[in-house]
Amino acid sequence: MSLLTEVETYVLSIVPSGPLKAEIAQRLEDVFAGKNTDLEVLMEWLKTRPILSPLTKGILGFVFTLTVPSERGLQRRRFVQNALNGNGDPNNMDRAVKLYRKLKREITFHGAKEVALSYSTGALASCMGLIYNRMGTVTTEVAFGLVCATCEQIADSQHRSHRQMVTTINPLIRHENRMVLASTTAKAMEQMAGSSEQAAEAMEVASQARQMVHAMRTIGTHPSSSAGLRDDLLENLQAYQKRMGVQMQRFK
């Protein structure tokens, strides 16, 4: 796996699924391929994106700044600085300075990542802030190691939280989670179907599923009534793709 592929993988792992994630993935690909060369426009676009947490925006802004060539005097962006200040905690800043001194001695991406993984997310963010604000300099490779370590920690905590929700025995939470997943799957089906004649059936299935979820929420139903709803939708989507000549493994 190339360095930039690895960076893209880690960064995208902390972005919530949805149309915005696909858009960000495209921007990252363009930036890494040297296609998107106006940092000012890119940062303005990032600043106005909805849904993303300030820290995720800060990390993406840091990655864009590392990758896109820019004039030396280009102003640093406040939304990135605020996200990478470690919540203003002086302890985070102290640890960030210690980490920075260690990173100065590293020359490889993996070496930097290993060193960074032993620090808290707050300290890692503060260290990125130091580098972003030009208070310290490291090689791009080392900076990317710091980025990936931060993303790994965030993704770990998100995964723990997700696992807790999936394994919860509370039937109401499981019921709502199944309905949310069915609804987002239906939305994805509608987007993928496009406007071809064969798409009418897939659109109809997706529309019915969304109406069903809407009705279930409106009248309130037994928590077990949503079981299998998303799986049925995915089976329909696979059947549609087969008819369209697209062979895909089921994505569960």
Curated annotation (Swiss-Prot):
- Where the record places motif Nuclear localization signal is 101-105
Query: Where's it mainly located?
Result: virion
Renumbered to this chain, region (RNP-binding) spans 165-252
Q: Which Pfam families match?
A: Flu_M1, Flu_M1_C
Output the Gene3D superfamilies linked to this UniProt entry.
1.10.10.180, 1.20.91.10
| Keyword Disulfide bond among UniProt keywords | no
Could you identify this protein by its name? Answer: Matrix protein 1
**The species this protein was found in:** Influenza A virus (strain A/Chicken/Pennsylvania/1/1983 H5N2)
